[in-house]
């Protein structure tokens, strides 16, 4: 069975209440349940992880090297600031898809810079909650050699 790690960064635990006009009304728990269900139907195991702390995300990536085949990451604000998460992803050699609920390229200038994009196998941005499901399809296709 293929094992995928879903990483959500800072403030994504507030989904459903934080700026619903941008991020929608679904909670992170709702998204994780729905994504896990879809993955299970495809014989994929998803491990969900969320942290507001950069070092915890780095540690999770390090701890996943031997058990995870692909990563889906919505790094939140760390997308624009974290060299340590970037380096952990590169060092892990685990293929990853960067994802965002909103279109980060149509927002404030500081959100247009990503420390992850050039190392990701792909980026999904701007499709709302569907970004998670599109990213899952992308990583599955990549890992199955359909890229």
UniProtKB/Swiss-Prot annotation:
Reaction catalysed by this enzyme: 3-dehydroquinate = 3-dehydroshikimate + H2O
Listed Gene3D superfamilies: Dehydroquinase, class II
Pfam family, one: DHquinase_II
The keyword Heme belongs to this UniProt entry's keyword annotation: no
Biochemical pathway: Metabolic intermediate biosynthesis; chorismate biosynthesis; chorismate from D-erythrose 4-phosphate and phosphoenolpyruvate: step 3/7
Binding site for substrate: 74, 80, 87, 101-102, 111
Keywords: Amino-acid biosynthesis, Aromatic amino acid biosynthesis, Lyase
BP-aspect Gene Ontology terms: amino acid biosynthetic process; aromatic amino acid family biosynthetic process; chorismate biosynthetic process; quinate catabolic process
MF GO annotations: 3-dehydroquinate dehydratase activity
Positions of the catalytic residues: 23, 100
KW Lyase (keyword) present: yes
EC number of this enzyme: 4.2.1.10
Site (Transition state stabilizer): 18
Family: Belongs to the type-II 3-dehydroquinase family.
PANTHER family: CATABOLIC 3-DEHYDROQUINASE
Oligomer and partners: Homododecamer.
Summary of the function given for this chain in its UniProt record: Catalyzes a trans-dehydration via an enolate intermediate.
Annotated protein name in UniProt: 3-dehydroquinate dehydratase
Organism: Prochlorococcus marinus (strain MIT 9215)
Gene (name only): aroQ
């Amino acid at each position: 069975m293929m094992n995928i790690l879903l990483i959500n960064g800072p403030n994504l635990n507030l989904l459903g209440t934080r700026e619903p006009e941008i991020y929608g009304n679904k909670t992170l728990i709702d998204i994780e349940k729905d994504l896990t269900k879809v993955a299970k139907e495809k014989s994929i195991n998803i491990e969900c992880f969320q942290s507001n702390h950069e070092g915890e995300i780095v540690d999770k990536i390090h701890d996943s090297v031997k058990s995870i085949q692909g990563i889906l990451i919505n790094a939140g604000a760390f997308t624009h600031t974290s060299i340590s998460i970037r380096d952990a992803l590169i060092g892990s050699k685990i293929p990853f898809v960067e994802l965002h609920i909103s279109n980060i390229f149509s927002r404030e200038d500081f959100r247009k810079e990503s420390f992850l994009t050039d190392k990701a196998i792909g980026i999904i941005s701007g499709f709302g909650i569907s970004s998670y499901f599109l990213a899952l399809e992308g990583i599955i296709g990549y890992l199955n050699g359909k890229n």
